[in-house]
């Protein structure tokens, strides 16, 4: 195994007694790539990592929460299909100086990763990413880790990993200009520029002016109010 691949494994370390598997299929009428996914309740081996990076199916998914209820990474899963504007998202992240890595996901949306050098409590990672997702305007997106603690037989939910092929990955990171980082060397360099020592280094920029009309409202509604409601979204926002 190459040094780059070993580093990739270190970056995405998670639960090692279970892992996810995903088998790709064709796109449905909404443009989403359909797939069959399941969890294997057995020890994760190096061969599974190798198979994933070699482009062999099924591809690999990792459960970020470990048996001690900590993790070294988490992600916001923005589930969108063809036409998602990754560059706009990256610009928004950079404007607020958030140390996040954006990857194109299987569906064409984005996996927005937050990496830390030392393990943190899964509950703290989940809370931080929930706050970030709401601030970015994606408060309804799934957050990984989805669990804050595991029982001895529990497995949690997995997230599909990027770099599912050495030459033609469909899931890969994007740099600060939105360009594809289509190999592990480029990804690792980008990771090193974003990883933080602890979650205290990840600060959400406060709004310049408090809107007292929305004081006490959920973060997702405060974000929507500050940016304006899209045409036709009034009823949906009222429902929220």
Predicted regions and their residues:
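Short beta-strand
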Residues: 62-65, 100-107, 142-145, 151
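Short amphipathic beta-strand starts and helix->beta connectors
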Residues: 53-62, 92-100, 224-228
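Long, low-complexity interaction regions most often at the N-terminus
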Residues: 3, 10, 124, 137-138, ...
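A common structural junction motif
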Residues: 96-98, 130-139
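Modules that initiate DNA replication and primer synthesis
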Residues: 27, 71, 78-81, 87, ...
């Amino acid at each position: 195994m190459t040094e780059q691949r070993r580093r990739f494994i270190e970056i995405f370390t998670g639960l090692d007694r279970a892992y996810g598997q995903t088998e790709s299929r064709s796109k449905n009428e909404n443009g989403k790539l359909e797939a069959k996914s399941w969890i294997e309740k057995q020890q994760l081996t190096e061969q599974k990592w190798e198979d994933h990076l070699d482009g062999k199916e099924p591809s690999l998914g990792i459960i970020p929460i470990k048996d001690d209820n900590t993790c070294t990474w988490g992600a916001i899963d923005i589930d969108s299909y063809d036409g998602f504007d990754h560059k706009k998202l990256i610009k928004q992240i950079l404007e607020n100086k958030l140390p996040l890595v954006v990857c194109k996901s299987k569906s064409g949306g984005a996996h927005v990763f937050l990496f830390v050098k030392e393990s943190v409590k899964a509950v703290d990672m989940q809370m931080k990413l929930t706050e970030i997702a709401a601030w970015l305007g994606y408060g309804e997106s799934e957050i990984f880790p989805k669990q804050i603690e595991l029982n001895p037989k529990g497995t949690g939910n997995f997230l599909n990993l990027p770099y599912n092929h050495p030459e033609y990955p469909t899931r890969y990171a994007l740099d600060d200009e939105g360009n594809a980082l289509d190999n592990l060397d480029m990804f690792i360099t980008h990771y090193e520029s974003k990883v933080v020592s602890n979650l205290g280094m990840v600060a959400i920029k406060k709004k310049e002016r408090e809107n007292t009309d929305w004081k006490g409202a959920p973060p997702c509604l405060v974000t929507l109010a500050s940016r304006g409601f899209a045409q036709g979204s009034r009823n949906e926002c009222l429902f929220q």
